[in-house]
Amino acid sequence: MKIKLITVGKLKEKYLKEGIAEYSKRLGRFTKLDMIELPDEKTPDKASQAENEQILKKEADRIMSKIGERDFVIALAIEGKQFPSEEFSQRISDIAVNGYSDITFIIGGSLGLDSCIKKRANLLMSFGQLTLPHQLMKLVLIEQIYRAFMIQQGSPYHK
């Protein structure tokens, strides 16, 4: 199985880079992880709804160009389904059993994701109603993917 993580915006914070590097290394035992950072569009202060929609569309075009036709796509969205870690682990396992070799996770930029990305997604997933920086979500998601594999292995890491 290969996991692809598509994110909008460049990661700048050193502490986040270090955490992501650590969990990426750990994940290497279980899966190939491909991380794709796409540039975000600059959002003007007090942007209109039309400007925001235009920005989301441009970011969506970049995202769509990186999604494989046969990828199982999980998009992070506040309105998505929340899972306990054990259920998330089982979902990842089930996706592989159902014939998907590539899982693509998508984290949008500061404005979120365009509706076309949400429609393409096989699953909308949420980590709750909290608003978190999308750069931080990258670290949280990678840790949860690692945790999912550790749960599948019966490791005490999850305790």
Swiss-Prot record:
It is an enzyme of class 2 (transferase). Coiled coil: none annotated. CDD domains: RlmH-like. InterPro entries: Alpha/beta_knot_MTases, RlmH-like, tRNA_m1G_MTases_N. S-adenosyl-L-methionine binds at L76, G108, F127, G128, Q129, L130, T131, L132. The keyword Phosphoprotein does not apply. Gene3D superfamilies: 3.40.1280.10. Pfam families: SPOUT_MTase. It catalyses: pseudouridine(1915) in 23S rRNA + S-adenosyl-L-methionine = N(3)-methylpseudouridine(1915) in 23S rRNA + S-adenosyl-L-homocysteine + H(+). Keywords: Cytoplasm, Methyltransferase, rRNA processing, S-adenosyl-L-methionine, Transferase. It is found in: Cytoplasm. Belongs to the RNA methyltransferase RlmH family. Homodimer. Specifically methylates the pseudouridine at position 1915 (m3Psi1915) in 23S rRNA. This is Ribosomal RNA large subunit methyltransferase H. It comes from Streptococcus suis (strain 05ZYH33). The lineage of its organism: Bacteria, Bacillati, Bacillota, Bacilli, Lactobacillales.
